[in-house]
A protein has these predicted regions:
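NAD(P)+-binding Rossmann beta1-loop-alpha1 motif at the extreme N-terminus of oxidoreductases
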Residues: 1-49
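Nucleotide donor/acceptor-binding cores
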Residues: 2, 72, 165
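Generic preference for hydrophobic
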Residues: 29, 60-61, 169
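Rossmann-like NAD(P)(H) cofactor-binding subdomain of soluble oxidoreductases
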Residues: 54-154
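Internal alpha-helical scaffold of NAD(P)-dependent oxidoreductase catalytic cores
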Residues: 93, 134-207, 219-257
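NAD(P)-dependent Rossmann-like dehydrogenase/reductase catalytic/cofactor-binding core
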Residues: 227, 235-351
Length: 351
C-alpha cells in the first residue's frame, strides 16, 4: 500500500486526506497552526451534503516534513501562490521515486515540461518566478491533475463537502504509467472518480475557461455565479473572455469538445455559489490571480495572441487584491512582483 502525503489540509487537501484515510489507506497530513492541532486532537471531520458527518484519522499529522520522511506520492493541496515558497521545503518528503501531484487551479508551472513543440521547456514567470518551483520539483516527478471537488474548510479540522468527486490524472508526457494507474486505484478506493488521460492539458484548459472568467468577474462584482451569468452584460463578458482564452489554447494545439455556451450553462447550475476567488477577497486573503489569469495572459504573449479582456480582468483583480489584503505588500507569488508590475516596468525602461 502506497504512502500518500497531503501537503495543506484546507478544503480540497482536507477532503482528499479524509477520503483516503476513511478507505484505510496510509495518509500523512502536513498542516500547521490551529488546523494541525485540531487534526491531531480529533482527526478530520467531513460534513456531507445529507447532513451526516464522518471522522477520519490520518496515520500522521505533522508540520515536521523531516519527521514525515519520504512518501510514494505527495499531493500539493495548497493554493498555487503558496507553491514558490513551499517547493524548497519539500525535500524530506521526496524519495528517489516519489511522484508529486499539484492539485491547483489554473495553468500549472510544469505545463511546458515533458512535451514536444516549439515551447517545450518554457518557464512561465508569472507562476514559477525565477524557476524556484521547477528547480526543486524535477519534471519527471510530476503527475498532472484536475480537481472538481467543491468544499469549504468551515473550522480547523472540519471540511464541508459540497459536490464533485472527479479527480482526473495524467502524466505530462501522456504515458499511462504504472504509477499513475496505481494512484488512480488508490483514489478510486477512496470513493473518487479518477479517469487517467493521455492529454491532461486539454482538461486543464476546459476547467480553466471557467476559473479564469467567472472567478475574477465574481470577485470584482462581489456576485455569485448565478448573478454573473444572469446579468446579460457580464454573461457577454464571460463569453468574450472565454473566446480569447480559446484562441490562446488553440495556438498550443488544444481543441475543445464543448461550446462556450455549454460551458456557461454548466456553471449556471451552481446558482448562488461564490467562487473561491470571491471568498478569498472577502476574507482578505491572497488569490490565485497569477495562476488563473496572469498565466493565461503570459501564454497569450508567448503565442502572440492579443488578450485585451484577460489583461483588463487581470489588472483589475491584482489591484483589488492589493487593496483588499491587509498588510500584504505584494499580490503575486511570495517575494515576487505581479506580472502587471513587471510589464509596466519594462514599458518604463523602454520609454
Amino acid at each position: 500500500m502506497m504512502r500518500i502525503a497531503i501537503v495543506g489540509a484546507g478544503s480540497i487537501g482536507g477532503y482528499l486526506a479524509a477520503r483516503l484515510a476513511l478507505s484505510g489507506q496510509r495518509v500523512t497530513v502536513i498542516a500547521r497552526g490551529a488546523n494541525l492541532s485540531a487534526i491531531r486532537a480529533n482527526g478530520i471531520t467531513l460534513r456531507l451534503p445529507d447532513g451526516t458527518e464522518e471522522r477520519a484519522i490520518p496515520e500522521l499529522a505533522t508540520d515536521d516534513l523531516a519527521a514525515a520522511g519520504p512518501h510514494d506520492v505527495v499531493i500539493l493541496g495548497v493554493k498555487g501562490q503558496q507553491i514558490p515558497a513551499l517547493a524548497p521545503t519539500l525535500g524530506p518528503l521526496l524519495g528517489p521515486e516519489t511522484a508529486v501531484v499539484p492539485a491547483q487551479n489554473g495553468i500549472p508551472w510544469w505545463y511546458f515540461q515533458r512535451c514536444d513543440g516549439p515551447y517545450a521547456g518554457h518557464r512561465l514567470e508569472s507562476i514559477d518566478p525565477g524557476g524556484v518551483i521547477s528547480s526543486h520539483i524535477a519534471p519527471e516527478r510530476v503527475i498532472g491533475c484536475v480537481t472538481y471537488q467543491a468544499a469549504e474548510l468551515e473550522a480547523p479540522g472540519v471540511v464541508r463537502f459540497i459536490e464533485g468527486n472527479r479527480f482526473t490524472l495524467g502524466e505530462p508526457d501522456g504515458v499511462k504509467t504504472d504509477r499513475v494507474r496505481a494512484l488512480a486505484r488508490a483514489l478510486t478506493r477512496a470513493g473518487l472518480k479518477v479517469p487517467v488521460r493521455s492529454d491532461i492539458r486539454t482538461e486543464i484548459w476546459v476547467k480553466l475557461l471557467g476559473n479564469m472568467t467567472f472567478n475574477p468577474i465574481s470577485a470584482l462584482t462581489r456576485a455569485t455565479l448565478g448573478e454573473v451569468i444572469g446579468y446579460a452584460p457580464t454573461r457577454e463578458l464571460v463569453a468574450a473572455t472565454m473566446a480569447e482564452a480559446q484562441e490562446v489554447a488553440s495556438r498550443l494545439g488544444i481543441t475543445f469538445a464543448i461550446t462556450t455556451e455549454r460551458r456557461i450553462q454548466g456553471a449556471a447550475q451552481m446558482g448562488s455559489h461564490k467562487t473561491s476567488t470571491l471568498q478569498d477577497i472577502e476574507a482578505g486573503r491572497p488569490t490565485e490571480v497569477e495562476w488563473l489569469v496572469g498565466a493565461v495572459a503570459e501564454v497569450g504573449r508567448l503565442v502572440e495572441v492579443p488578450t485585451p479582456r484577460i489583461d483588463a480582468l487581470y489588472a483589475c483583480l491584482t489591484l483589488l487584491e492589493r487593496t483588499s489584503c491587509s498588510g500584504r505588500t505584494d499580490h503575486g507569488s511570495p517575494g515576487t512582483k505581479s506580472m502587471v508590475d513587471q510589464i509596466y516596468e519594462k514599458e518604463r525602461d523602454h520609454a
